[in-house]
């Protein structure tokens, strides 16, 4: 509730309920009313990326969940203002955008597939959190940073948050089909879109 108020999104209630049915599927319904901060023609979805676009992220990746269950995933600040500023700064050069909740390996694949392409990530470019290698950066999840595709280089910072180009979108191939995420480390390239957080499997 407090987080919602901080972003002018109060939890109104009225449709919050539980039921005692135990032998059927769990059903969760979330109703959201919102007014876009940008004109309707500039709503940025995840399906606008095209081969040749740069892939970039805000902040640092990996290490969001600590061994005791605590960590950055419990007190992150949504990148709402950064997303709006990014759209205003890049204009039509901002092609697609989403948040990173299941890890870059999973989410880059979703963004690439939505635009009928593949994603190639440069391991050496990843902005990793302290104590994390590139593998943790692409698989840990719960980063809640922005992942976006753009035609031109993005600004180096947004409201004090670093922005890093980590790769680019490419056309699918026989080796790397639509939705594949490929990470390059030195001269090596491997698919990683099978990694990351899978809901209902616990990992």
Feature locations, PLM:
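Active-site glycine-rich loop that binds ribose-phosphate moieties when present
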Residues: 30-47, 71-89
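Acidic, Ser/Thr/Pro-rich beta/coil linker or hinge segments at domain junctions
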Residues: 18-19, 158-203
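Short, conserved charged micro-motifs
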Residues: 38-43, 152-160
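Glycine-rich anion-binding loops of enzyme active sites
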Residues: 1-65, 168
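Short, ordered loop/turn segments at secondary-structure junctions
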Residues: 15-17, 60-61, 100-103, 124-126, ...
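Active-site-proximal betaalpha loop/short-helix elements
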Residues: 73-142, 172-173, 182
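Short hydrophobic/aromatic beta-strand micro-patches
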Residues: 33-35, 147-151
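A generic structural signal for well-ordered alpha-helical segments
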Residues: 4, 90, 112, 158-159
């Amino acid at each position: 509730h407090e987080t919602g108020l901080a972003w002018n999104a109060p939890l109104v209630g009225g449709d919050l309920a539980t039921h005692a049915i135990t032998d059927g599927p769990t059903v969760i319904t979330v109703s959201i009313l919102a007014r876009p901060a940008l004109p309707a023609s500039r709503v940025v979805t995840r399906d606008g990326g095209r081969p040749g676009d740069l892939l970039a992220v805000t902040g640092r990746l990996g290490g969001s969940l600590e061994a005791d269950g605590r960590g950055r995933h419990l007190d992150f600040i949504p990148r709402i203002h950064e997303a709006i500023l990014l759209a205003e700064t890049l204009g039509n050069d901002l092609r697609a955008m989403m948040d990173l909740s299941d890890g870059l390996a999973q989410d880059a694949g979703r963004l690439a597939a939505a635009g009928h392409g593949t994603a190639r990530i440069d391991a050496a470019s990843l902005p990793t959190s302290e104590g994390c290698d590139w593998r943790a950066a692409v698989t840990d999840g719960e980063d809640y940073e922005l992942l976006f595709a753009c035609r031109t280089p993005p600004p180096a910072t947004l409201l004090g948050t670093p922005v890093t180009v980590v790769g680019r979108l490419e056309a699918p191939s026989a080796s790397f089909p639509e939705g594949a995420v490929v990470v390059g480390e030195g001269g090596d390239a491997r698919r990683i879109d099978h990694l990351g957080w899978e809901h209902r499997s616990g990992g």
